Amino acid sequence: MINPLITKFIDWKHYNEGASKRTVEAYTAALLRFVVFLDGRDLLLATVDDVQLFGGIWLHKQGVTAVSRRPYIAAVREFYKWLTATKAIASNPTEGLSYPKTGRKLPSMMTLDSAEKLMWSPDFCTFDGVRDAAVLSLLLGCGLRREGVSSLNESNLVQMDFKGDRRYVLKVVEKGEKERTMPVPREVDMVLRLYLEHEDLKAIDRTLANGDKVLFVSLNNMTVPAHEYIGDRRRMAPKAVGEIVKKHGNKAGIPAGQLHPHALRHLYGTELLESDVDLLIRQELMGHADPKSTAIYTHLAMRKKMAEADRANPFTKIRTPVGDLISKLRKPS
């Protein structure tokens, strides 16, 4: 049975605006799909984050291309514009909802099979292999953007007690956002510790003027004189983060369309969605939270977020060298 609000809107669109039969059918199909996305939640209570998630990663996960998503977004925008005009709702959640850019094809989401192959590629017997594994782990296990990984300093890693263990929590600032604090899944935590405790890293001068240290270092920047190759000039560039994905992806035989840092972020977001992680936690972990809608919360309990990150990140569904080590350590002797 079609929601009465949708029926009223479609009738208005058809009789008042003279919309064609084809438009009416397309809008109806789009809104019914939005109802499926809401999964029983009231249409009148949809938030900015709901419509953004629907028009973006959810439809993308359903196999709807950027071009094909435009009619869905048009239907949802028109529907909520009508609800606002009829005073059924106080504010329009789609006001800032834009159409997807179609000038360039979005990178494919990396599959779990590809992610597993990728994580087996770095050589843990070498320093650059451990460094690359740590970079890939943050992209896959925390859903960071390449700029976010590049900008990290050691001070962005903070330790907390969690179920008797010392675990890392990550302070992240991406794309001009306010700083957000997110948990580091267990496997990612272990790879980061392997990297930070490596003897080769200790020999590199990566200290900044404020006493902090660059987290991820470049190893072969030939454009910088040796005596200047210290501090912030040792920082791995965002472009180099993408090159690490391509290098190990090509080595593992992964399709070229998946070899982009954002393809790993898409997989991370999809796993959170498919694992039924609470919407508010999902928004915080992805950095999608709307400050207006979350201002009433001081913060979510970090232990709750840590448990969800351990449960729902892509590493829980793939086999990796570090995952095998964790499994062995957990077995009783």
Q: PLM features: residue spans?
A:
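Conserved catalytic core of the tyrosine transesterase superfamily
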Residues: 1-333
